Swiss-Prot record:
The gene is nqo15. It comes from Thermus thermophilus (strain ATCC 27634 / DSM 579 / HB8). NDH-1 is composed of 15 different subunits, Nqo1 to Nqo15. The complex has a L-shaped structure, with the hydrophobic arm (subunits Nqo7, Nqo8 and Nqo10 to Nqo14) embedded in the membrane and the hydrophilic peripheral arm (subunits Nqo1 to Nqo6, Nqo9 and Nqo15) protruding into the bacterial cytoplasm. The hydrophilic domain contains all the redox centers. Nqo15 is bound to the side of the complex near the N-terminus of Nqo3, where it interacts with subunits Nqo3, Nqo2, Nqo1, Nqo9 and Nqo4. The lineage of its organism: Bacteria, Thermotogati, Deinococcota, Deinococci, Thermales. GO terms for cellular component: plasma membrane. Keywords: Cell membrane, Membrane, NAD, Quinone, Translocase. This is NADH-quinone oxidoreductase subunit 15.
Length: 129
């Protein structure tokens, strides 16, 4: 992955995190940071240049039960992607960055509207569990 493609993937990740925060605020659920990037945790005195420290985040119900988990590959991974897991719906999607298209799952663009619909499905699956 080229440096510019890598940068664009992490910028798309920041955008996805903003969608998660917006969804949480609109629906009255929790946005939670689950994990930071290892190179942020162990950076010591080195500069940190990724646009966020968050590597894994979740949307959870009022009791803290996650219904959607999202993560991005760490910088050292060779094949970088964003993963979306819907634990109760048994769905696991991978999104990749494609120039000119943004985030795509397979060949389908991952838009904010599509993400909100996916989160709604995941939330409904948790309600019936």
């Amino acid at each position: 992955m080229s440096a510019s493609s890598e940068r664009e993937l992490y910028e798309a990740w920041v955008e996805l995190l903003s969608w998660m925060r917006e969804y949480a605020q609109a629906k009255g659920v929790r946005f939670e940071k689950e994990a930071d990037f290892p190179d942020f945790i162990y950076r010591m005195e080195r500069p940190y240049d990724l646009p966020t420290t968050i590597m894994t985040a979740s949307l959870s119900d009022g009791l803290g039960e996650p219904f959607l988990l999202a993560d991005v590959s760490p910088r050292h991974a060779k094949l970088k992607r964003i993963g979306l897991r819907l634990p109760r719906a048994h769905i696991h999607l991978h999104a990749h960055y494609e120039p000119g298209k943004g985030l795509v799952t397979g060949k389908i663009p991952l838009t904010k509207e599509r993400f909100f619909a996916l989160a709604d499905r995941a939330r409904e699956a948790l309600a019936f569990a």
